[in-house]
């Protein structure tokens, strides 16, 4: 059990006091002042990478962030344009597909700490099996899982277990099929985490946080030009040491990320590097009793594993992005990234549960010497030309991806019944060191090469046709064991088309429709069924987009997506295998709104209805897909009081709700995770010192609601629990 809560609270207060004193000193220290030509307001704007229209009497042009050759911009909470959907800088209303953006302002106001936090603002999003909280795992429009390749960084696939960190500027979500431009993906869509890039105006921030759980974090973010050169730099660093909210565990993480940009007359080059070390709890959550259909009646803080349930590792990512403008009509974007993640973990895995006595059967497992590395290359030639008197936005592209995953030593020990959830005693099951030769050397290697083309044809000022196609070639092998046994060995290619149409009723209102296909080769390190057939999908979508009073952007979409040969896991004799369902379908309605209602009042809101079920399968026909919420919703308002009483000090407050409906906990729908709604709020006060000092208090899950975010899907023994009430105090100074 966790000890010394009073001491922890005292330590948290000490962290806050120390941070405030240090930041106040930095704010007042004249030696920290930079070029006098850079005004504080300009520095602040560059730091947030958007311009707040409420900060002055006029609406300023937003700063466009160059993100790996992908241009995109937001204004406060409002998305303006994106390159994720078309790979060229396109207004949202010209895109025949739903696109959502969680801006930097939203992330800062809500103090988002994970991709799940950011995506709680987007419709139709649920959490899937996170492998004990160690991986990003996101369901989009009914489809998705961990390690499914749907989460990109600056438009390129990576080996990162978690893509959201201190380098994140914003999160863009492209709904529906994206295979034509991004390759092997589900029809539910893809997520692009856009990172912060060097800016040509100096700005900086130093911050510290304290959590009510215990511990906190500290970090820096500085960017600006290198005097006398055409270069700009950025340096981001953060150290985090926070107590886990359950009865034992700690999250430790440090990250450093330098980047350098060169701005020539026609060419821009950005080189970036990010290193991260992490140690996080490996926590599979709680048990649901199949007799009652509810979680076991145990304090949610009580864990059923051991203190050695930890995943430790480090990751590195190097990326190079080049943008060259041949002339006003033609631009070449080149991108490359190399990413590497190595990790090891230990866990006391719950294998069975006795509902009458509360006794659980556990097994000491571990994965040691795991590594994943990924190369991703893409080249896009973009043209904006007239052909036959009609405007065409042309895209010719090619890409190559290589991913190699190896889990070296798989450790498996004998099962033991030595733990009771109603009287937990830890330490009776030591970590295991016995290597299972049959399970070790799990390896998957996939390489893909693609060429694609797309045209956005502007027939008139009102009608836009979008069409494209991709040829996708892949080579895939997977297997395990000592000696190694190959269970998957396949290769092939396929054309993947897309088409869409936009009708702009007015410059601020558009209607659209699209149809697209997807293709995903599948593998299994262990399958009773040999080579798995590739997933194939098709999706249809209609919708409308609005810009309201030049401040709010809204999107309404209706869609239906069908997939066949969908992979899912099942347990056979205690081991997990992969098989495929015949056909599944997801249908739904989504509404998203983001932006400014007035100069002072901003909002971001969403609602999604998703009906996802198995249509054709001998075992699960008619069943709901695991972890897919039938209803999702969020609503968050902020109010900026502006300058108070002529003092120069500013106050900003906000509050909102987020929630999801019930979700199937297992493939056979033996139980359901209940729906939930939780409330959050924040207040930020900025003192106008020589450098602005901001104190921000974020309250999460204000009413301390017990809720469950996802299940592992194959059994009732692993269900993630949402965090209880927490308070995070942040002190930051900007330069």
Task: Give the label of every model feature segment.
Residues 370, 394, 540, 626-735:
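Conserved C-terminal beta-signal and adjacent last beta-strands/turns
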Residues 240-244, 257-325, 340-372, 415-444, ...:
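Acidic/polar loop-and-plug regions of large Gram-negative outer-membrane beta-barrel proteins
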Residues 323-337, 341-347, 504, 511-512, ...:
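Membrane-embedded beta-barrel scaffold of Gram-negative outer-membrane proteins
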Residues 61-201, 542:
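Acidic, small-polar-rich N-terminal luminal/periplasmic segments of exported/outer-membrane proteins
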Residues 261-263, 372, 391-403, 442-563, ...:
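Structural signature of Gram-negative outer-membrane beta-barrels, strongest in the C-terminal barrel
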Residues 167-169, 180-258, 262-268, 316, ...:
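Outer-membrane beta-barrel translocator/receptor signature
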Residues 277-294, 402-406, 475, 498-541, ...:
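Surface-exposed extracellular loop regions of Gram-negative outer-membrane beta-barrel proteins
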Residues 560-562, 580-666, 732:
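Gram-negative outer-membrane beta-barrel transporters
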């Amino acid at each position: 059990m966790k000890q010394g809560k009073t001491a922890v609270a005292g330590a948290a207060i000490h962290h806050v006091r120390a941070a405030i004193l240090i930041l106040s000193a930095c704010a007042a220290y004249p030696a920290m002042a930079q070029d006098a030509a850079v005004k504080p307001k300009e520095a602040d704007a560059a730091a947030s990478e958007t311009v707040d229209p409420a900060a002055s009497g006029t609406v300023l042009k937003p700063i466009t962030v160059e993100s790996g050759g992908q241009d995109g911009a937001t204004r406060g909470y409002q998305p303006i344009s994106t390159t994720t959907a078309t790979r060229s800088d396109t207004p949202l209303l010209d895109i025949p597909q739903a696109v959502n953006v969680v801006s930097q302002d939203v992330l800062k106001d809500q103090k988002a700490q994970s991709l799940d936090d950011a995506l709680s603002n987007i419709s139709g999003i649920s959490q899937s099996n996170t492998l004990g909280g160690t991986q990003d795992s996101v369901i989009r429009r009914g489809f998705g899982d961990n390690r499914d390749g749907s989460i990109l960084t600056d438009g390129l696939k990576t080996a990162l277990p978690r893509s959201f960190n201190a380098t994140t500027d914003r999160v863009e979500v492209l709904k529906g099929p994206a295979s034509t431009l991004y390759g092997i993906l589900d029809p539910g869509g893809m997520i692009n985490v856009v990172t912060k890039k060097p800016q040509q105006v100096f700005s900086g921030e130093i911050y510290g946080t304290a959590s009510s759980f215990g511990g906190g974090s500290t970090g820096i973010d500085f960017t600006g030009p290198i005097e006398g050169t055409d270069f700009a730099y950025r340096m981001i660093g953060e150290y985090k040491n926070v107590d886990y909210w359950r009865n034992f565990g700690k999250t430790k993480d440090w990250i450093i990320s330098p980047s350098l940009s060169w701005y020539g007359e026609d060419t821009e080059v950005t080189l970036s590097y990010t290193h991260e070390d992490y140690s996080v709890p490996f926590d599979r959550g709680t048990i649901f009793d199949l007799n009652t259909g509810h979680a076991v009646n145990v304090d949610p803080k009580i864990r059923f594993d051991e203190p050695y349930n930890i995943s430790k590792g480090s990751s590195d990512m190097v990326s190079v992005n080049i943008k060259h403008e041949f002339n006003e009509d033609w631009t070449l974007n080149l991108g490359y990234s190399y990413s590497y993640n190595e990790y090891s973990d230990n866990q006391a895995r719950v294998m069975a549960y006795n509902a009458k006595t509360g006794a659980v059967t556990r097994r000491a497992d571990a994965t040691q010497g795991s590594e994943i590395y990924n190369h991703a290359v893409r080249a896009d030639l973009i043209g904006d030309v007239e052909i036959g008197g009609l405007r065409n936005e042309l895209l010719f592209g090619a890409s190559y991806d290589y991913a190699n995953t190896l889990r070296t030593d798989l450790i498996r020990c004998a099962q033991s019944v030595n733990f009771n959830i109603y009287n937990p005693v830890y330490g009776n099951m030591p970590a295991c060191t016995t290597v299972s030769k049959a399970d070790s050397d799990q390896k998957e290697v996939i390489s893909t090469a693609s060429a694609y083309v797309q045209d956005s044809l502007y027939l008139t000022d009102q009608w836009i046709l979008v069409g494209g196609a991709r040829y996708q070639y892949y080579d895939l092998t997977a297997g395990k064991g000592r000696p190694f046994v190959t269970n998957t060995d396949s290769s092939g290619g396929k054309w993947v088309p897309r088409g869409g149409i936009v009708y702009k009723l007015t410059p601020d209102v558009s209607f659209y429709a699209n149809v697209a296909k997807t293709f995903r080769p599948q593998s299994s390190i262990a399958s009773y069924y040999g080579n798995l057939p590739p997933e194939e999908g098709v999706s249809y979508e209609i919708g409308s987009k609005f810009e309201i009073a030049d401040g709010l952007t809204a999107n309404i979409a209706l869609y239906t997506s069908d997939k066949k040969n969908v992979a899912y896991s099942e347990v056979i004799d205690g081991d997990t295998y992969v098989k495929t369902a015949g056909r599944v379908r997801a249908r739904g309605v989504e509404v998203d709104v983001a932006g400014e209602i007035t100069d002072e009042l901003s909002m971001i809101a969403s609602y999604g209805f998703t009906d996802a079920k198995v249509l054709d399968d001998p075992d699960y026909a008619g069943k709901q897909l695991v972890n897919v919420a039938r209803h999702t919703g969020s609503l968050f308002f902020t109010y900026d009081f502006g300058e108070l009483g002529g003092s120069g000090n500013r106050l900003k407050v906000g509050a909102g709700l987020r929630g999801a409906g019930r979700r199937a906990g297992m493939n056979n729908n033996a139980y359901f995770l209940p729906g939930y709604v939780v409330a959050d709020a924040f207040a930020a006060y900025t003192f106008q010192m020589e450098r602005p000092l901001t104190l921000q208090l974020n309250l999460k899950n204000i009413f301390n609601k017990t809720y469950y975010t996802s299940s592992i899907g194959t059994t009732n023994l692993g269900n993630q629990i949402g965090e209880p009430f927490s308070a995070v105090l942040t002190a930051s100074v900007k330069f």
